[in-house]
């Protein structure tokens, strides 16, 4: 199945990538995600995402994060929970929780309405998951 999906949808997500509950991809998507990457719960990703590393140092994406189209996330960065990354951003440094960031390189623009673009949130119970 991995092979069929990756060729048809132009999706390359390593089987070693850790992905949380409620992961959502919209539109016609094309993405490349490195195997060291950790993706939290309720992460919404738009088309043409690239998460890469040359040194196997993971990018860590928190919970309830929206990532806009044409975003590149480079190397060892952490994107905080409830954050939004604007279209075309190149993330080279950590983004704090509850932030909206955009630009090349990505910079925090504000802390208003964190995570507002995350729709269809999966409701999970951490205690039940541990059992």
What are these model-derived regions, one by one?
Residues 61-73, 104-131:
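C-terminal segments of enzyme domains that contribute to small-molecule binding surfaces
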Residues 9, 14-15, 20-21, 26-35, ...:
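Left-handed beta-helix
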Residues 1-6, 11:
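Charge-rich, low-hydrophobicity low-complexity segments
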């Amino acid at each position: 199945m991995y092979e069929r999906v990756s060729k048809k949808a132009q999706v390359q997500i390593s089987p070693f990538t850790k992905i949380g509950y409620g992961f959502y991809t919209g539109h016609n998507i094309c993405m490349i995600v490195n195997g060291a990457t950790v993706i939290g719960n309720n992460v919404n990703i738009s088309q043409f995402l690239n998460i890469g590393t040359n040194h196997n140092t993971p990018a860590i994406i928190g919970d309830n994060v929206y990532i806009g189209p044409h975003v590149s996330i480079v190397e060892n960065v952490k994107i905080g929970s409830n954050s939004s990354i604007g279209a075309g951003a190149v993330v080279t440094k950590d983004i704090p929780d509850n932030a909206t960031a955009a630009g090349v390189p990505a910079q925090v623009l504000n802390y208003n309405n964190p995570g507002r673009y995350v729709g269809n949130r999966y409701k999970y119970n951490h205690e039940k998951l541990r059992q």
